[in-house]
């Protein structure tokens, strides 16, 4: 053994060939600050070996390196810029030393080589992968860009076009795709990976492979003539602006950095990369996007903890077909849980099966399933007009019309037919679970399971705990949601639960703004382009359905009359009274026609302005700041109330529910991250300017207390490790 640390080992293989093995404690290798330092120490030893002829780099795990340790990121980002710059120079010096070894080097890639793992293999002369390997640089998805030379070496290895695609999108590539673009030199069976890498290394040592020629382009300027460069980078910048937009600066910064570095060799190009990385790391967007990654890990860990030891059901049932029931049945069947789909109406069953077939057809067109697989998945959905076999289902999801009497009757009816351990869940969006539980003899076996539409796309499932819901019931439903590929978040019961409870104050703020003369076109534009929502409130109402929103609005007003009751007709009332229900009937705030692909195309409708004039002040232009404040303050206040009342258990779960359930702009990180970015005191001061508008704008006491004590919702990350001593700075 030449060198050994907690995360890697260096030893001789044979005849002057050394092997560097990444083998950290735990299930995966990460390129954390400690491992980077350990790599430097291993190179110290290696550089002194006069008999060294070659180096093979591999992993003892099922993946090479899954990336940097993202739990360290916020600490790094909170460091003074000069400290972060110093650490990046330190790290890049180590990767340069790996690249500059006076012998050929090769990486054997099994599983993932992402982020810093990808940058590490780029520093070797050759790369060989097993078929399941995936390689990529996902940093731009986290609001940053490669920082260990990825933006320098990848373009020089692959050419600018392929490198820009990988870096700007943050997507990883398969081993076979990596072979096609020149990212790896060979793909071999897993059992032959190390042997083949050793053979290739020996060929390089014997002069049969020119390892110096493989290394040379990575040290030199990018080989592009001025015309090619202008075309390549102009197209890339245009594409990035179109896809990422102004709220996600990292992809464009990466493209511009690669462009600026193209004419330089490695040293100057790395300096440019570091100089671009540091400001990105200090940005609010990076903190928010890294925060989302960490919150996602936390939420998934909570789900795993809740459902520990509980298997997903072998058979499920959905009561109520149609689009929603069909979507739930499809998702269940797709993820290998057979499902009974029951309805009282043959047409609804046909609609549900057609929905499942349509979604599977899309999978077929994309090559995700073949015809045989599609048929076998569809065969696991059993449509039925009666309850035959329902007693065999372990979890039953009620998804009938959003009417408390109908839901209660259906739940009571099915409960009489099933065993004492069968779990019942209601896919209600607003009706309190405790209200529905009154019709049941075994309320401990009952909870809410709120899917979002469209089911196959929306990652969130709200699991609603009623007053009598047992832990066993929650565990079973969380296990089912997880098996379905969803992110379950447990919330406590109240009208609207969490997501809809906080959505309707936002829509109420919109309604008041329109009442006071706001133009809904301008409001939508500001909330989409400036704040970053995928769709503005008027467009969202059309997509949700004006009739659905009108009904939910009444439920919320009854549940929270002190804030959500209103004594005036609003825009939703006007649309509803005029039977403008949104996309479902082709007219709402906007008019909808079908495009060539059969998707709804939004168009302006002058008739709407005339209808809204009945309930609005004369049109006036509000500032972007006013529009954002008047719509967002009610939502933010309600989100905070939900945490203070224990409806949600943590800021992390609240923020993930908003991002996954409502499409809250990820670059803000969720309401709690947004508040931490603004500063609680700044937010309270802003909200007070709108307090005259009513109770929805009154800041909750807990948030006022945080403002007074200068507290945040998320803990402040500790300082960056000092690069020379590995101790907190």
Curated annotation (Swiss-Prot):
Catalytic residues (positions): 450
CDD domains noted in UniProt: crotonase-like
GO BP terms, alphabetized: fatty acid beta-oxidation
InterPro entries: 3-OHacyl-CoA_DH_CS (IPR006180), 3-OHacyl-CoA_DH_NAD-bd (IPR006176), 3HC_DH_C (IPR006108), 6-PGluconate_DH-like_C_sf (IPR008927), ClpP/crotonase-like_dom_sf (IPR029045), Enoyl-CoA_hyd/isom_CS (IPR018376), Enoyl-CoA_hydra/iso (IPR001753), FA_oxidation_alpha_subunit (IPR050136)
Residues given in the record as substrate binding sites: 296, 500, 660
Pathway: Lipid metabolism; fatty acid beta-oxidation
Site (Important for catalytic activity): 119, 139
SUPFAM superfamilies given in the database record: 6-phosphogluconate dehydrogenase C-terminal domain-like, ClpP/crotonase, NAD(P)-binding Rossmann-fold domains
Keywords noted in UniProt: Fatty acid metabolism, Isomerase, Lipid degradation, Lipid metabolism, Lyase, Multifunctional enzyme, NAD, Oxidoreductase
Organism: Yersinia pestis
The keyword Lyase belongs to this UniProt entry's keyword annotation: yes
Similarity comment: In the N-terminal section; belongs to the enoyl-CoA hydratase/isomerase family.
Residue ranges, annotated region (Enoyl-CoA hydratase/isomerase): 1-189
Protein name per Swiss-Prot or TrEMBL: Fatty acid oxidation complex subunit alpha
């Amino acid at each position: 053994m030449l060198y050994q640390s907690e995360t890697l080992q260096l030893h001789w293989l044979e005849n002057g060939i050394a092997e560097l093995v990444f083998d950290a404690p735990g299930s995966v290798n990460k390129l954390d600050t400690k491992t980077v330092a350990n790599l430097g120490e291993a190179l110290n030893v290696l550089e002194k070996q006069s008999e060294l002829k070659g180096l093979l780099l591999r992993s003892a795990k099922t993946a090479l390196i899954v990336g940097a340790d993202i739990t360290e990121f916020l600490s790094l980002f909170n460091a003074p810029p000069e400290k972060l710059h110093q650490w990046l120079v330190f790290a890049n010096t180590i990767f340069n030393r790996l690249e500059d070894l006076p012998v050929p080097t090769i990486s054997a890639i099994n599983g993932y080589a992402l982020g810093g793992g990808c940058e590490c293999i780029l520093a070797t002369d050759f790369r060989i992968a097993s078929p399941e390997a995936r390689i990529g640089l996902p940093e731009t998805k986290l609001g940053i860009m490669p920082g260990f030379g990825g933006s320098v070496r990848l373009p020089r290895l692959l050419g600018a076009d392929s490198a820009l695609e990988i870096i700007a999108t943050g997507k990883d590539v398969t081993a076979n795709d990596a072979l096609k673009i020149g990212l790896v030199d060979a793909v071999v069976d897993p059992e032959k990976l190390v042997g083949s890498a050793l053979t290739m290394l020996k060929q390089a040592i014997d002069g049969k492979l020119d390892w110096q020629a493989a290394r040379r382009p990575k040290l030199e300027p990018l080989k592009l003539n001025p015309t090619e460069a202008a075309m390549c980078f102009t197209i890339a910048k245009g594409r990035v602006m179109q896809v990422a937009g102004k709220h996600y600066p990292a992809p464009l910064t990466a493209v511009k950095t690669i462009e600026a570095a193209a004419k330089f060799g490695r040293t100057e190009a790395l300096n440019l990369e570091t100089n671009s990385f540091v400001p990105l790391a200090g940005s609010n967007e990076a903190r928010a996007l890294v925060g989302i990654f960490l919150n996602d890990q936390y939420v998934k860990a909570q789900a795993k903890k809740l459902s520990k030891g509980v298997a997903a059901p072998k058979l499920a049932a959905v009561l109520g077909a149609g689009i929603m029931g069909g979507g739930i049945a499809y998702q269940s069947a797709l993820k290998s849980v057979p499902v009974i789909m029951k309805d009282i109406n043959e047409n609804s069953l046909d609609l549900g099966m057609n929905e499942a077939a349509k979604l599977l057809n899309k999978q077929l067109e994309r090559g995700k399933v073949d015809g045989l697989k599609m048929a076998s998945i569809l065969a696991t959905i059993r449509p039925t007009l009666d309850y035959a076999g329902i007693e065999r289902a372990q979890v039953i999801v009620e998804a009938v019309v959003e009417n408390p009497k109908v839901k209660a009757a259906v739940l009571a009816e099915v409960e009489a037919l099933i065993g004492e351990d069968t779990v019942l869940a209601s896919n209600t969006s607003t009706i309190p679970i405790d209200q529905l539980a009154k019709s049941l003899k075994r309320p401990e076996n009952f909870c809410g399971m709120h899917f979002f539409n469209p089911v196959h796309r929306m990652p969130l499932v709200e699991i609603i705990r009623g007053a009598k819901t047992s832990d066993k019931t929650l565990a079973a439903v969380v296990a089912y949601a997880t098996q379905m590929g969803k992110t379950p978040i447990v919330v406590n019961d109240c009208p609207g639960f969490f997501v809809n409870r906080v959505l309707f104050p936002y829509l109420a703020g919109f309604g008041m703004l329109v009442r006071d003369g706001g133009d809904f076109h301008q409001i939508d534009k500001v909330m989409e382009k400036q704040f970053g929502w995928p769709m503005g409130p008027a467009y969202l109402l059309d997509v949700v359905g004006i009739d659905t929103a009108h009904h939910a609005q009444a439920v919320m007003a009854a549940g929270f009359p002190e804030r959500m009751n209103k004594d005036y007709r609003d825009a939703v009332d006007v649309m509803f009274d005029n039977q403008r229900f949104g996309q479902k009937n082709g007219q709402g705030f906007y008019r909808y026609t079908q495009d060539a692909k059969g998707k709804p195309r939004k168009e302006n409708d002058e008739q709407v302005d005339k209808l809204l004039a009945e309930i609005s002040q004369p049109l006036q232009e509000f500032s972007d700041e006013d529009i954002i404040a008047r719509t967002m303050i009610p939502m933010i206040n309600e989100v905070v109330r939900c945490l203070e009342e224990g409806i949600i258990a943590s800021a992390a779960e609240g923020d993930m529910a908003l991002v996954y359930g409502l499409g809250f702009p990820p670059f803000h990180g969720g309401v709690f991250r947004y508040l931490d970015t603004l500063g609680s005191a700044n937010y309270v001061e802003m909200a007070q300017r709108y307090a005259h508008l009513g109770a929805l704008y009154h800041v909750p006491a807990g948030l006022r207390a945080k403002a007074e004590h200068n507290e945040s919702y998320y803990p402040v990350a500790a300082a960056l490790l000092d690069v020379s001593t590995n101790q907190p700075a």
